[in-house]
Amino acid sequence: MEFLLLLSLALFSDAMVMDEKVKSGVELETASAVCVYDAYYKDHTKYWCRGYFRDSCNIIAFTPNSTNRVALKDTGNQLIITISCLVKEDTGWYWCGIQRDLARDDMDFTQLIVTDNREDRANGFSSDPSGNRTRSCRASKAVQKAEGSRMSILIICILITSLGIIFIISHLSRGRRSQRNREVTGKSISRNPQASQGPSMVSITLARI
């Protein structure tokens, strides 16, 4: 009987519930979402994914892993998702999910809207009044741009070096061909006087006769 009760709980209950269906955030700040789940699933893998349809959403991270901007924290009955350094491209639909063995993964969604207007900040999002997060995000973006510039310069240097090597090889190849042509021409010239002496000697002999 207890097994049937647990089985029905696994099959028909809502194991994962999102705290809010719509969230608003501000660029360069931090967003956080909380998904509450039944403690029965505390040892199950949870995940955070993006997409309008649950069955085709793109998984961003599984517990206990995180990415450079998305951190997942599993407390045993809550999955806390934190997105740092928000950008407008983060606007979209997101799902928190829990993997289940005997049933379809249970998931719940929220819509995230990121703006550049600080007055549109809504509940569910944390901000740092001192502006440390904003400065950190801007510094991170500056580092990324600097790394991109260094990579572009490196690619240009490699291209210039490659073109220089190709030019040198081409120049040496043309020089060798020219030298061979001169050698062939010299040999031809040295042979022609011998060939031209024949007719002159014949003409002299005929004249004497």
From Swiss-Prot:
One of its GO terms (cellular component) is membrane. SUPFAM superfamilies: Immunoglobulin (SSF48726). Residues 187-201 have a biased composition (Polar residues). Residues 1-15 form the signal peptide. It is a single-pass type I membrane protein. The chain crosses the membrane at residues 152-172. It is found in: Membrane. It comes from the Eukaryota. Its main location: membrane. The keyword Magnesium does not apply. Keywords: Membrane, Signal, Transmembrane, Transmembrane helix. InterPro entries: CD300_family_receptors, Ig-like_dom_sf, Ig-like_fold. Residues 179-201 are annotated as: Disordered. This is Transmembrane domain-containing protein TMIGD3. The lineage of its organism: Eukaryota, Metazoa, Chordata, Craniata, Vertebrata.
